[in-house]
């Protein structure tokens, strides 16, 4: 008889319900993870990957949560580089089952050793947000030392890493945030922080790069701030279906990359990067986590999947 595990799955009404499922078995080239913590992205409720498989057929009962931290609990044939008991963190394929469960399956290329300076709770807040910030600033926008960059949403789960990475690159960092988070974003390394409710970010002047974690009017007002040869990168999920040619060229979706994650993970142990958790909840309260009603000023919401 297969071992069983607790998990949370989406219902037809996109609420989350607790279920008991068999512990998955790693196939060749796969790793079984005993999950300790998982990051929450409330918009996952409406992602196409929640309701459809890669071939377009309808999908039900998906397990959410694609960034996680945990322990290697099983190795499929041919897997090298990891051993049972290794502490890891990673970012699963979008169409794979998520990690809001006691165990999940992933590929070695999606994983990295967990930074020793981070707890599992902290580490679970990192993979998607940090890789989004890194790939957006350095792969898509190719941010250079001395350039001026405007980061919309500097206190958000992605924005707080974008500010730290841009500062580390040697850019002049301008960020927007709520009034309550201005001091926090300055401590991350921003040179200027603008209250998005009361201030006008246009007054900061022309910039080389804009990193937009938001859409709507804020994005519409941003284009005119770009210098000649300026670059805008947009990550807001609602932009995926945009027909605006400018938006289509600016929008990108982060990709799994264990090597990038391993390289960036060293920056936590050196003190160059810091992770921030907005709140943590037990797995039984996952539906509340995905409701978007959990208060907190900055960082990512985390679900604990074990009691350890």
Per-segment meaning from a language model:
Residues 192-197, 281-284:
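Short acidic-hydrophobic, aromatic-tinged amphipathic segments that line or gate anion-handling sites
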Residues 81, 91-153:
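NAD(P)H dinucleotide-binding glycine-rich loop of Rossmann-like/cofactor-binding domains
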Residues 22-39, 51-95:
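Glycine-rich beta-strand-centered segment in the early N-terminal region that forms part
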Residues 84, 126-195:
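Mid-domain Rossmann-like dinucleotide-binding core that forms the NAD(H)/NADP(H) cofactor-binding site
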Residues 214-276, 305-308:
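Glycine-rich phosphate-binding loop and adjacent beta-alpha segment
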Residues 2-3, 261-308:
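C-terminal hydrophobic helical "lid"/dimerization subdomain
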Residues 177-181, 197-199, 234-241:
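Short, polar loop motifs at secondary-structure junctions
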Residues 202-209:
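A short acidic, Gly/Pro-enriched loop at the edge of an enzyme's catalytic core
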């Amino acid at each position: 008889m297969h071992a069983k595990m607790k998990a949370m799955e989406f219902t037809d009404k996109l609420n989350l319900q607790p279920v008991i499922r068999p512990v998955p078995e790693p196939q060749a080239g796969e790793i079984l993870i005993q999950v300790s913590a998982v990051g929450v992205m409330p918009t996952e409720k409406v992602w196409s990957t929640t309701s459809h498989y890669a071939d377009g057929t309808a999908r039900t009962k998906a397990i959410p949560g694609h960034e996680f931290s945990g322990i290697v609990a099983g190795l499929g044939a041919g897997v090298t580089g990891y051993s049972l008991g290794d502490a890891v963190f990673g970012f699963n394929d979008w169409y794979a089952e998520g990690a809001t469960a006691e165990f999940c399956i992933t590929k070695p290329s999606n994983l990295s050793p967990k930074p020793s300076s981070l707890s599992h709770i902290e580490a679970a807040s990192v993979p998607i947000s940090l890789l989004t910030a890194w790939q957006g600033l350095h792969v898509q926008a190719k941010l250079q030392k001395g350039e001026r960059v405007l980061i919309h949403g500097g206190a958000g789960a992605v924005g707080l890493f974008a500010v730290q990475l841009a500062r580390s690159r040697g850019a002049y960092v301008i960020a927007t945030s709520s009034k309550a988070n201005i001091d926090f974003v300055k401590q991350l390394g921003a040179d200027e922080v603008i209250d998005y409710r009361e201030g006008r970010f246009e007054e900061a002047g022309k910039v080389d790069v804009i990193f937009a974690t938001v859409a709507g009017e804020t994005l519409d007002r941003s284009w005119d701030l770009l210098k000649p040869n300026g670059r805008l990168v947009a990550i807001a999920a609602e932009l995926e279906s945009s027909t605006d040619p400018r938006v289509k060229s600016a929008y990108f979706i982060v990709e799994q990359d264990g090597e990038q994650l391993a390289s960036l993970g060293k920056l936590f142990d050196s003190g160059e990067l810091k992770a921030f958790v907005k709140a943590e909840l037990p797995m039984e309260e996952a539906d509340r986590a995905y409701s978007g009603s959990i208060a907190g000023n900055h960082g990512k919401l985390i679900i604990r999947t074990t009691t350890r």
